[in-house]
Amino acid sequence: MNEYIVSARKYRPMKFSDVVGQDALTTTLRNTVKSGKLAHAYLFCGPRGVGKTTCARIFAKAINCEHPTDNGEACGACESCKAFEEGRSFNIFELDAASNNGVDQIKQLMEQTRIPPQVGRYKVFIIDEVHMLSQQAFNAFLKTLEEPPAHVIFILATTEKHKILPTILSRCQICLLYTSPSPRDPKTS
């Protein structure tokens, strides 16, 4: 029997060039990878289903790629890329704040920031639905965000930017994602 895979995961873009409708963001992220001038925190904002988590994962992979392409894409062949694609990366952590929103989960995650990366240059922490964190969790996270280790990059994703503390927002590079306009049907145009 074949293993069932949700189509959204099966067909999830694996590189910037596969992402549809976010050209401004993917160009910016590619240029960031090419230049090597990374912020220590990014906040991806936009409605549900526009690709915030997908772009965060692609960016995390590209950040740690040992041989990025000339246009800022991950090579897909180095040990770091393979480990990420196979789900065995020790340097990229994902937390779904919708179901792990307590102070204990954030403190556990922040403990991981102390340990330098084993493969690749950075430890990347993706916190999805970051607006769901409790007040205490936000405060615990803020301590690390204020003075992060040099080997740590945070990528936060949210549908509700207004629920995030201003002190968190001020420490992030904000990246907006938009819904793509529906393709027009030539028969009705």
Stretches with model-predicted labels:
Residues 1-174:
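P-loop/Walker A NTP-binding region and its immediately flanking N-terminal helices
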Residues 178-189:
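Single conserved hydrophobic/aromatic residue that forms the stacking wall/gate
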